Amino acid sequence: MPRPEPPPWLSAAAIATAERLLAGHRQAFGRPLLAGVDAGRTPLQAAQELFVAATVVLSHDGAADPRLIYANRAALLLWRRPWGAMVGLPSRLTAEPAERQRRALALEQARRKALSGYSGIRVDSGGRRFRIQNARLWALPDGGGQPGGQAAAFSNWWWLEPPRSGSPPPLSGRPNPVGGTEPGPSVLPLHA
């Protein structure tokens, strides 16, 4: 019997991105992104731990109009998007239009060096605004050690307004790779 396909956040590409996220953060800030994720973990274990972490972690590629290439479970829940809708989304769309220029300037600064203490306003899939505070931004190295995108991580955020009428309900449970959510434990199995 063939092995089932892993969920998209445990694909070979996502595992490689998770490794780059963790290595890039350590290089930029001199400390691990997540407590307990150390060199003794396999890349698969580190990718699983990064995906289920309470800290919001996301990254985009280095294109002229960058697109998200990774979002952990906390990011998917906050932006109320399943993996397939979040990954591939132009990253500028995670911020409201009035914040996009300010965001672009901060990203340019982070491209040259790491940036901590970033704050800004973001918008979820239904248009509901929230503030992030004390985010860390850093260059995401490509396979050759050159900048190949950027990453962000933050734990401090809060809603700026009540849910909008007609907004999609918040995701709860475990994000489903096909879309929507399914209830489940906080630790994901190796295969969906």
PLM feature spans:
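PAS-family sensory modules
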Residues: 1-64, 107, 136-171, 187-192
